[in-house]
Amino acid sequence: MNFQLRIQRIAFALLAVAVAAFSMTNVLVTSAYAQGIPREAIPVNPPQPVDNDGKIEVLEFFAYGCIHCAQLEPRLAAWVAQLPADVKVKRVPANFASRGIESGPIFYTLEAMGVLEKLHQKLFDAANLENVMLGHPPTLNKWLEKQGVDPKKYEEMQKSFSVQTRISRARKMNGDYRIESTPSIAVNGRFMLSGGGEQLFPNLDQLLAHVRATNKPVALATPAATAAPAKKK
């Protein structure tokens, strides 16, 4: 009997913790809606640290094998190009392999080689439109060679400490933000939007306005992400 009572008490305690966590999430979401935040925006709990540089940080979590990310990229680039100077957009590769492609090693290696911006969209197109098996090293090497990238230098760069460090930081950031799907976009460590529907950019603009109005940065952190190019106003 004592053993059964202990089991029941443990079960009730676990249930109470789950109910409390669910209730806290509901409180955060309800409070956010009351402040005029888009219904599609999910509060990040707990809020994540951002750079302490006075700019609003937008993170795009993506995967090269994700067709929705591929479709979003041109629209996102156009949105980034018209952003004011108080906003910075950074890309963070997803942890999971989409279409067998691990985006992080490719992304950070090409960034270190100085050819990322030239090949970023081409990687999406190769994976999703041309069905190139970028997750297969020999196939990736052949594709890189066609783009003017030396496969041997690519492999050497990927093994470098700086690239491996950025890959590790990106993986941690994925865990901190609990990324399970792409595209996912985080705004200033406080709100998350998923998918690339037509309402995405109006929702992002609304969140930027909200962050400017509240102006409550979380803390200083060293990001793993890479800034997307933007035109300054």
Tell where the protein language model's regions lie, with residue ranges:
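Stable alpha-helical elements in mature extracytoplasmic
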Residues: 54, 68, 72-75, 102-103, ...
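Structural microenvironment flanking redox-active thiols in thiol-disulfide oxidoreductases
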Residues: 83-113, 117-145
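Extracytoplasmic thiol/disulfide redox context detector
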Residues: 2-98, 171, 213-233
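C-terminal cap of thioredoxin/glutaredoxin-like
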Residues: 2-5, 63, 146-233
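Loop/turn elements at helix/coil->beta-strand transitions in domains of secreted/extracellular proteins
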Residues: 54-57, 85-88, 113-120, 150-152, ...
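Solvent-exposed loop/turn segments at secondary-structure junctions
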Residues: 64-68, 95-99, 125-130, 160-163, ...
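Sec/Tat-exported extracytoplasmic proteins
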Residues: 65, 76, 80-83, 110-114, ...
